[in-house]
Swiss-Prot record:
Residues 260-285 are annotated as: Disordered. InterPro entries: FMuLV_rcpt-bd, TLV/ENV_coat_polyprotein. Residues 1-33 form the signal peptide. A lipid is attached at C605 (S-palmitoyl cysteine). This is Envelope glycoprotein. Keywords: Cleavage on pair of basic residues, Coiled coil, Disulfide bond, Fusion of virus membrane with host cell membrane, Fusion of virus membrane with host membrane, Glycoprotein, Host cell membrane, Host membrane, Host-virus interaction, Lipoprotein, Membrane, Palmitate, Signal, Transmembrane, Transmembrane helix, Viral attachment to host cell, Viral envelope protein, Viral penetration into host cytoplasm, Virion, Virus entry into host cell. It comes from Xenotropic MuLV-related virus (isolate VP62). Glycans are attached at N43, N58, N301, N333, N340, N373, N409. One of its GO terms (biological process) is symbiont entry into host cell. A motif (CX6CC) lies at residues 530-538.
Length: 645
């Protein structure tokens, strides 16, 4: 059993390496930022670069999530190598400078060794991390090098038949059969393995590539693979909290000025050029709230004018500020991420109240299946599901306009198609007036009607479906568009507020840790700040990262123990773990079943013994009955008879 980490008082555990520990904790805290939604779409760029020349062999950009942006990368070996392998005599040796050298290079095998994880004895960059046989993990060679843990696989691509000595079609050799642009005739295909799709690509990964020759040394080149996420915003600097600075009061209503007749400019005056209009200011909190209430009124007035003759619309001041109504709708399927999926949204907002029944996608748990009228399973493949106009996907990871099927197939995430409505309650005038009247008798608590109950489901089947009866579709009106614009503006502000608060907290922790590190350096002679103060050392742990990682490791260990426990059980013990009703059924019928089995096994033997015993007793009784009907004759001795005569 392991000893506890703090078996002695903390003041006796002062570490002379405290500043270095603080530096490590600072780096760890800076990296533990809350992760985005798995359905967030980014602009991802993969680059293959020759580390010896700095030349880029391939740069592929695509839109997608961080889970499915692992495309096949196509490039030419000579674009990667350049002139590093050229021999002094181009007509004899291989290389990439001459057409003949490119053709001879195509005949050689090659092998690749990883530099991001170097095994013992594999050497360094000079050997291409291939210091001995067995270090190679991929390539195109007769011994078929492979690995189950490396991140990529690199093979030769399809070379067209009849492609001659690799002439360059752009320098006057276009009429020669087999000529290609740039003389490229050594195509390579790089694919990501399952381990590569799970790995972290925060830093470049390095590999060494060597050309296999039967004689002489194998030429070496080094290349790196880098992933760049272009639209991830930078971290905010230390300063005022933008969440507080944007809390502006409601704007004052603008006074309408009557138009005046323009006067001609005086003679000799220079013509005045109107300046550029001032930049539009982002609406403050007060304006956003008023826009929500105004949009709710316009939408309600369009659908039910009788309810808006005299009413009170109250915006709920406490969370949840929004509620969703599950609806049925037809989403659009895209092979690539559409434009509305690539917005820079962090998807950190969730819905705590969803009502109704609608369309569900993914592995919906039993606790949320009441929200599903129809549950669809995603098929294999990488594509995106965009929500219809006026709706959004409410997922267990947050709100998102698009879904990635790759994320749904790899995780336990689930989503429901919902309409978003602000938490605005509708009250009649009698209820509001009654709150200010002093009454001794109180009526029953009135039922609060929210905007979701009054207008829920309109975009997917309410007013929008009433066009045939003469009703205007709400989704196509300015009132609904104004309400949707107010909702989107408020949601965007909420997301920015959450991100700003998170980054402000992280920045504050970095400042505190930096001050602590500086104090430790100042009191280095005394053994650090804790030793100078003669107090226990306190260390900072970012719960958003450390706890999440710890729980993930704990969950992984529990799964491993569960699998180990199940593998150690016999088939009979495993039957009882499959379902609870099976255990109850077995325990109920086990007793009668055992009794019946014993009767079938020993019943015939016992029955035969009993029958034989009865037969013996009956035979004895019969013998006694027969002896009672006869008398026994006396025996006479012949000698005695003769003596009597």
């Amino acid at each position: 059993m392991e000893s506890p980490a703090f078996s002695k008082p903390l003041k006796d555990k002062i570490n002379p390496w405290g500043p270095l520990i603080i530096m490590g904790i600072l780096v760890r805290a800076g990296a533990s930022v809350q992760r985005d939604s798995p359905h967030q779409v980014f602009n991802v760029t993969w680059k293959i670069t020759n580390l010896m020349t700095g030349q880029t062999a391939n740069a592929t950009s695509l839109l997608g999530t961080m889970t499915d942006t692992f495309p096949k990368l196509y490039f030419d070996l000579c674009d990667l190598v350049g002139d590093n392998w050229d021999d002094p005599e181009p007509d004899i040796g291989d290389g990439c400078r001459s057409p003949g050298g490119r053709k001879r290079t195509r005949l050689y095998d090659f092998y690749v060794c990883p530099g991001h994880t170097v095994l013992t004895g594999c050497g360094g960059p000079r050997e291409g991390y291939c210091g001995k046989w067995g270090c190679e993990t991929t390539g195109q060679a007769y011994w078929k090098p492979s690995s189950s843990w490396d991140l990529i696989s690199l093979k030769r691509g399809n070379t067209p038949k009849g492609q001659g000595p690799c002439f360059d079609s752009s320098v006057g050799s276009g009429s020669i059969q087999g000529a290609t642009p740039g003389g490229r005739c050594n195509p390579l295909v790089l694919e990501f393995t399952d381990a590569g799709k799970r790995a972290s690509w925060d830093a470049p990964k390095t590999w060494g590539l060597r050309l296999y020759r039967s004689t002489g040394a194998d030429p070496v080149t080094l290349f790196s693979l880098t992933r760049q996420v272009l639209n991830v915003g930078p971290r905010v600097p230390i300063g005022p909290n933008p969440v507080i600075t944007e809390q502006l009061p409601p704007s004052q209503p603008v006074q309408i000025m009557l138009p005046r007749t323009p006067r001609p400019p005086p003679s000799g005056a220079a013509s005045m050029v109107p300046g550029a209009p001032p930049p539009s200011q982002q609406p403050g909190t007060g304006d956003r709230l008023l826009n929500l209430v105004e949009g709710a009124y316009l939408a309600l007035n369009l659908t039910s004018p009788d309810k808006t003759q005299e009413c009170w619309l109250c915006l709920v001041s406490g969370p949840p500020y929004y509620e969703g109504v599950a609806v049925l709708g037809t989403y659009s399927n895209h092979t690539s991420a559409p434009a509305n999926c690539s917005v820079t949204s962090q998807h950190k907002l969730t819905l705590s109240e969803v009502t109704g029944q609608g369309l569900c996608i993914g592995a919906v748990p039993k606790t949320h299946q009441a929200l599903c009228n129809t549950t669809q399973k995603t098929s294999d493949g990488s594509y995106y599901l965009a929500s219809p106009a006026g709706t959004i996907w409410a997922c267990s990871t947050g709100l998102t306009p698009c879904l990635s099927t790759t994320v749904l197939n790899l995780t336990t995430d689930y989503c429901v198609l919902v309409e978003l409505w602000p938490k605005v309650t509708y009250h009649s005038p009698n209820y509001v007036y009654g709150q200010f009247e002093k009454k001794t008798k109180y009526k029953r608590e009135p039922v609060s009607l929210t905007l979701a109950l009054l207008l829920g489901g309109l975009t997917m089947g309410g007013i929008a479906a009433g066009v045939g009866t003469g009703t205007t579709a709400l989704v196509a009106t300015k009132q609904f568009e104004q309400l949707q614009a107010a909702i989107h503006t408020d949601l965007g502000a909420l997301e920015k507020s959450v991100s700003a608060l998170e980054k402000s907290l992280t920045s504050l922790s970095e400042v505190v840790l930096q001050n602590r590190r500086g104090l430790d350096l100042l009191f280095l002679k005394e053994g650090g700040l804790c030793a100078a103060l003669k107090e226990e050392c306190c260390f900072y742990a970012d719960h958003t990262g450390v706890v999440r990682d710890s729980m993930a490791k704990l969950r992984e260990r529990l799964n491993q123990r569960q699998k180990l426990f199940e593998s150690g059980q016999g088939w009979f013990e495993g039957l009882f773990n499959r379902s609870p009703w099976f255990t109850t059924l077995i325990s109920t019928i086990m007793g009668p079943l055992i009794v019946l089995l014993l009767i079938l096994l020993f019943g015939p033997c016992i029955l035969n013994r009993l029958v034989q015993f009865v037969k013996d007793r009956i035979s004895v009784v019969q013998a006694l009955v027969l002896t009672q009907q006869y008398h026994q004759l006396k025996s006479i001795d012949p000698e005695e008879v003769e003596s009597r005569e």
